[in-house]
């Protein structure tokens, strides 16, 4: 298994796009409003996966105490900060320096010690993490196989990986790209439907890196429930993975 390189995973135009959004990342009514709506749903899945993997009490407030967590494509820290509050020693990696600056400032303001790094996951040679997460990221990278391989290298034996990404379906194209950008739910240029991957494709990418996909849940939307975990995979999905 080879490490990814800067030229194979980071798309400069993607890093620049998200870097321009850094100043509004923590504004729930700003350009990242959809992420703020999505984050509680993702966090619910992440917490349940942590408890299932390590047998921790769902009522406990620090189930990751003594564990190292890595979030790749961390943006300004929307996942890193909750992981730190769950007790983890957290490292966040992002390709945009503007995001790392915003993340560091926000964490400092909240009294959280999070190790933020700007760069490409393979080039940073990070290893030994009990939990590796990368949510809504793989659809933005240049070489998906190299990216998954680098995530696998970072994972410690017995560790847990959690990934989420939009599915490549007619429904996701209509709602997540065309409609969402047209009415301003996400900034234009955020999503490129051809880069979305199906669960089957992700399963194959994980297998190529020596990983086995575990739990698979959809993230759906309805007017009554809003965004929620679902058996419907048509829009977005979130998965666990472990070493095969």
Describe each model-derived feature in a short phrase.
Residues 165, 184-201:
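Acceptor-substrate binding/catalytic loop of class I
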Residues 194-210, 216:
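Short alpha-helix
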Residues 227-244:
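Core SAM-dependent methyltransferase catalytic element
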Residues 1-32:
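N-terminal, positively charged/glycine-rich alpha-helical extensions of SAM-dependent methyltransferases
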Residues 37-65:
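Conserved alpha-helix/loop element of class I SAM-dependent methyltransferases that forms part
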Residues 57-62, 67-171, 199-202, 239-243:
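Conserved SAM-binding loop
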Residues 172-182:
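Short, flexible, mixed-charge acidic loops at enzyme active sites
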Residues 50, 54, 107, 206:
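Conserved hydrophobic residues forming the short capping helix/wall of the S-adenosyl-L-methionine
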């Amino acid at each position: 298994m080879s490490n990814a390189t800067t030229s194979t995973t980071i798309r400069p135009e993607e890093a620049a796009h998200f870097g321009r959004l850094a100043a509004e990342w923590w504004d729930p009514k700003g350009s990242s409003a959809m992420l703020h709506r999505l984050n509680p749903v993702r966090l619910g899945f992440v917490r349940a996966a942590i408890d299932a993997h390590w047998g921790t009490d769902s009522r406990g407030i620090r189930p990751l105490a003594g564990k190292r967590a890595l979030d790749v494509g961390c943006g300004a820290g929307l996942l890193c900060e909750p992981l730190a509050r769950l007790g983890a020693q957290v490292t966040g990696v992002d390709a945009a320096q503007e995001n790392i600056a915003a993340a560091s400032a926000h964490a400092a303001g909240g009294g959280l010690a999070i190790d933020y790094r700007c760069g490409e996951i393979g080039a940073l040679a990070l290893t030994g993490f009990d939990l590796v997460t990368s949510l809504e990221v793989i659809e933005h990278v240049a070489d998906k196989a190299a990216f998954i391989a680098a995530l696998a290298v970072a994972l410690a034996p017995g560790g847990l990986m959690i990934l989420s990404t939009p599915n490549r379906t007619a429904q996701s194209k209509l709602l997540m790209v065309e409609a969402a950008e047209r009415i301003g739910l996400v900034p234009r240029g955020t999503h490129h439907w051809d880069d979305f991957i199906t669960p089957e494709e992700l399963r194959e990418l994980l297998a190529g890196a020596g990983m086995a996909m575990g739990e698979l849940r959809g993230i759906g939307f309805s007017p009554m429930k809003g965004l929620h975990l679902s058996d419907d995979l048509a829009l977005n999905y979130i998965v666990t993975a472990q070493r095969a």
